[in-house]
Amino acid sequence: MSSGTPTPTGAINRRGPFRPGERVQITDERGRITTITLAEGGEYHSHKGFLKHDDLIGAPEGTVIPNTHGILYQALRPLYKDFVLSMPRGAAVVYPKDAAQIIVKADIFPGARVVEAGVGSGALSIALLRAVGDYGCVHSFERREEFADVARGNIETMFGGPHPAWKLSIGDLQDTLPQVEEPGSVDRVVLDMLAPWECLDAVAEALAPGGVLICYIATVTQMSRLVEGMRLDGRFTEPECDETIVRGWHVEGLAVRPDHRMVAHTAFLVVARRLADGAVRLAPKRRASKTDFSEEDMNAWIPMNVGEREVTDKKIRRAARDAKNLAAHAARANEIALEQNGTAQNDAAAEPAESAE
């Protein structure tokens, strides 16, 4: 890469030796994984000795070192999938398997203008920011300020500081979106909320023709109501619905079999595209429905009426505090990385001058 090419946000703290303030994933010989934050003079203790952080600081990624009792540990930076499952959370996160599908199905491209509603703990926001890059825009909407605080801390931890492409608005999407985004100015909309059908009008106004709406929803009743709402709206293509199931495999010589556990249903994804103004939706021909349903039937089994478990304020405050502390450590690690990178570039620039002499 040319020295004149700007480094993308978050890239510099994914390279080089381990630095103070970084999150590091250590794995013992039995495959047990622990994520620690490196600190000068810090120690990781277990019932079988302790590991000094100073032995890792300055070491290359992928180092294997013993603790005081000779137990070996493998040290690596957490991948995205590891980070989002271990980061502080106030709300449930979008699992990596679903985040990957959202990026692909919604065709999130570099420079895209994306609206996201339902930030939660920021797991999906991180994936979206990585996809749009520094010159795109992810405009996130969240109703609860305390959830936004957790997401902000996690995003800054992942990228080593604020991301230039991230904007955050507090409030209901259907009320706030028309005030902050021009009609037809948004490329993609990602909804993770209990009642996405309530936002269809605001979303249709904001989306550019050909833009993509993708919704992450938990139950079949939500999916049914959303799909019927899209069809009645008339400004979207026929919705596509699916779920993603991931099954690992155990491989040891010729002993090859599926794992005993798998990541099965987490949510459904519903995808549709915005039609041009005035276009008539192509409705697929299908057999007449054998049974009708009422509004009462549709509302009976949505999470808000079944009794969705609420996250306590105490847990949210603790998650926000932890996320803020981790973000501060990550910012320090990023500063060290920038200093090291600047020194390396200066040394590289000085080499041609020395050889010329």
List where the protein language model places each region.
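Conserved beta-strand signature within the Rossmann-like core of class I S-adenosyl-L-methionine
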Residues: 210-218
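Conserved class I S-adenosyl-L-methionine
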Residues: 109-120
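Conserved SAM-binding loop of SAM-dependent methyltransferases across substrates and taxa
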Residues: 121-134
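S-adenosyl-L-methionine
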Residues: 141-191, 196
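Short beta-strand element of Class I
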Residues: 135-139
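Conserved SAM-binding loop and adjacent beta-strand
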Residues: 13-16, 86-99
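A short glycine-rich, Lys/Arg-flanked "PGG" loop and its adjoining helix->strand segment in the class I
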Residues: 129, 197-209, 231
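SAM/dcSAM-binding transferase cores
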Residues: 2-67, 84, 228-357
